[in-house]
Amino acid sequence: MGNFEKFQDLLEKLFQFEASDLDFGIYRILNYKRSKIETFIREDLKNRVEAAFSKHKTERQEAINQSFEVIRQKVAQTLGDQALTPSGDLRKEFENTPLGKEFLEIKARKDEAQAIDEIQSQVFNDLYNFFSRYYEDGDFVPQYRYSIKGHKYAIPYNGEEVKLYWANYEQYYTKTGLLFRDYTFKADSIKAIFRVVSAREEVGSKKATKERFFVLDDENPVEIGQDNCIIIRFQYRELNEEEVKAYQVEGGSNTSKQEKINQKSFDRVLEEIKNTQIKALLMKTYKNDKPLLLYQLNRFSSKNTRDYFIHKNLKKFLSEQLDYFIKSEVLSIETLEKEKFLDKHITRAKVVKEIGEDIIDFLSQIEDFQKRLWEKKKFVIDTEYVISLDKIKDYAGEDFLKEVISHILKAQGQLKEWEELGFGKVEKEDDLILKRDLTGIEYKKLPVDTKYFSQEFKEKLLEKITENNDLDVILDGLLIKSENWQALDLILEKYKEKIQTIYIDPPFNKEQDADYLYNVKYKDSTWASILENRLRLAKGVLSNRGSIFVRCDYNGNWIVRPLMDEIFGRENFRNEIVVKRGAPKAGLFLQFENLKSIGVMYDNLYWFSKHVDRVIGMFIQALPETRKGYWTSFKKIYDRPTLRYEILGINLTKGQWMWNKERTYQAVENYQKYLEISPKTGETLEEYWERTGRKLDFVRRHMDTIQYWVPRKEETLLDNNWLDIPGYSQGWDFKTENSEILLKRVIESTSNEGDLVMDFFLGSGTATAVAQKLGRKWIGVEMGEHFFRFETDNGPSGILVRMKEVLSGKGNHEPCGISKDVNWQGGGFFKYQVVEQYEDTLDNIELKESVQAKIKFGDDYLLKYFLDFETRESPYLLNIEYLKNPFAYKLKVNLEEVGEPQETIVDVPETFNYLLGLKIKKIKTRDNHRKYLFILGEKDGKDIAVLWRPYEDTWSDDDLKRDKEFIIDELETWAPHIVYVNGQSVLTPKLGQHPAEIRYIEPEFKK
């Protein structure tokens, strides 16, 4: 294979030609342009190189010809015309003269310039050497290099004393889907599920690959259940030597190896299925002339193993690397010393730079497009509210609550959920009442979820409870189902510097059972990127007096500390706290049987503050009640004459008493009273002290000494050893469930009631549950399906289930944790939302070729501009045309993270609220021949009204006038400073009695 063909082959790998079967994400776009990319690689690239050479060759020849003409005339003038032959050559007798030598050198350069085409092959080899250094086992891995010899690396360094750097530095980790979620597809009457199960390792088995692959489960690969539901089970693991031979995967990329394994798995599954009808459906030809099952197998394995990272500035990185490569490899010292004619290597360097920059433009266009999709503020897909009955009464009155109850008794979904969560069966209004007395009716604190009711019900509920209350003030918390980077990015404007305490327990970077997808070579690097990306955003929402806690174990503490030093500042490190882990799972015999190291009984909790001089936090430890008060000497060694006086017949000549005379005599009297009362009550001094309010001092004479009583201490200041409390618990059937006692200590010590607490790796929901019980506001973010609900032997569980039980104060699990300790009785109000994900954004790309742009940019259109122009009308970027009805804006969304995405109406108003950073006060909905939604909020001390309604381009002047008058009437009582309105409008700053600035929503949205 020649150098050009070798470079072509590399480019096909870089542009994912092997992914031509894939129809999701960026692959769909590359496949859309597959023919044009192929034409560029197969034809245009060589033409570009030849054109570049031709240009530089002509420039070089003209320069050399000019130099040759100058030296020829100089020879003729100095040595005479006889020095040159009629053909223009130098006669032999003049060759050793200084001028003759110069003539011969320039003539040789002139002759050599005619043969410059021979270095074209060398240029392709240079380009191959440059780009191949970033292509590794099927992945594009941009890492700083300073030589191809010995595969040497370099890192950016600015003279820091210590520098933490990792392979995926300056990149986003983007694998936002669940780790190996069920993959489901349908074919007529059958439903197939690909499910990943834990691999069972044989003792002493020898791994032949470091890479992991999807292989069929050894024990139960295929199961056909009811209704023709097929479950196909896979393991994700390394291969042993026998498997490498069986699958015939000794060489090739990881992608090609997985495809070979998929082919074998396809054959095996068909062998296992005896039902001919099902087999026929799975074998029918599908996309790209592949059988349906094989196509889905390739799609499943690709979705779970591709697209880990996006570089934050690929063009800058590769351009800098290309410049260095040219200087160090193309124009190296060895080349400059060895070559007689440097002109051709300068031409070679220019062509390498020119063509290299073309390839970089193409690669960075794709990378920057993905970066733009990743960084785009995501849409809120759905918004619901959960509010307990008592809060409806508090905020909207008992009459409205009775109206709500009439709807509740008809909402079968709500009634069923209450029964399943252990709240009891509700059939009539009396079942909702806790007690009646002369003061009125006290209702049970049952949580009402608006998802079980109509949109009209939700709108009326929000309007009624915000008539006399500000919504964000009375909301206790916010749950967001989303990958956490996207959630943090979305809410950043609203919650900037508002969070008092952040606690996270991110997935640990363990070995085979890591909680995230990673390239085997870059497990720790992947974990570092996950944390770095998210911690940088978290710093933006942390208040200036706030604290952040990150829990990890020995697998990651060596990464967490320097990473947090870099992001939050070394001066803001407060402490490293040790937290108890769960009990060892193995028995004592097994621990000693294969003992390789001593057991690890604690995790690390890293505590940082936003600013060193503004942190609040005092950690208190409760002392055991078994510790009693005691008597001790009242005399002190210090010598203050004013504290020497007679007590019960004893005086001092030196030294001093502890207290002044007034306090001491009162303490003597207090003890005398106790001695008088105790024979009647039978109380100990400890009990008497408790009953009288724990404020009394006691002093007595004991033989020839004076003593005072030291009451038992209930609390003491903590150090960084927190092994006195559990670190994990198992109350909600969640593997890594943090204990409520641990979170109570963290939250109570670093925040006050009403402060905001956040956990963006929410897990089982402990942080939000504890925050609610302690009277804090809270935000929780989690992307897993357990956000909603999952079934256990103890009844339904999940974050949403847990928070509903917390609001109720009881259920299948509650009261639990700290509920009894803080006397938690329930009640509350929170919002939960589902947010668009990066994968959803990719699904909503619509390409529309731009003829004008192609004409304008010519050959550069494909390399630099096609993605920008051809996707600008996609729904993910906000299509203004679709926004004419803001209540019907649709995106393709996969809410259940399985199967194909479905068109879903998204919550445009809530999305815009986040973009503005609006603190919501009031919400009301009106009908004036169309739906009008009015939102009143506040930002930077100004009241802002946001108005949404459908509109048409065909509105007449009368329509616009009526629209204006209606809006003015509805906004009169709010008197906002700024009004945002969507679509057409004739609103003016003279807004009734209260002038206001009028702004349009669409330009703000497009930012």
List the predicted regions and their residue ranges.
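Glycine-rich, acidic and aromatic/proline-enriched surface loops and short helix-turn segments
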Residues: 504-509, 715-727, 748, 763
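Short glycine/proline-rich turn/loop motifs
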Residues: 464-476, 514-519, 722-732
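Conserved SAM-binding loop and adjacent beta-strand
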Residues: 730-742
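Conserved proline-anchored active-site loop of SAM-dependent methyltransferases
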Residues: 234, 497-513, 564, 757-771, ...
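Short acidic, Gly/Ser-rich segments with clustered Asp/Glu that frequently serve as metal-coordination loops
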Residues: 484-487, 509
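Conserved beta-strand signature within the Rossmann-like core of class I S-adenosyl-L-methionine
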Residues: 546-550
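Accessory, often C-terminal, charged low-complexity segments
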Residues: 1-459, 465, 471, 485, ...
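Mobile active-site "lid"/loop adjacent to the S-adenosyl-L-methionine
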Residues: 500, 507-530, 534, 543-545, ...
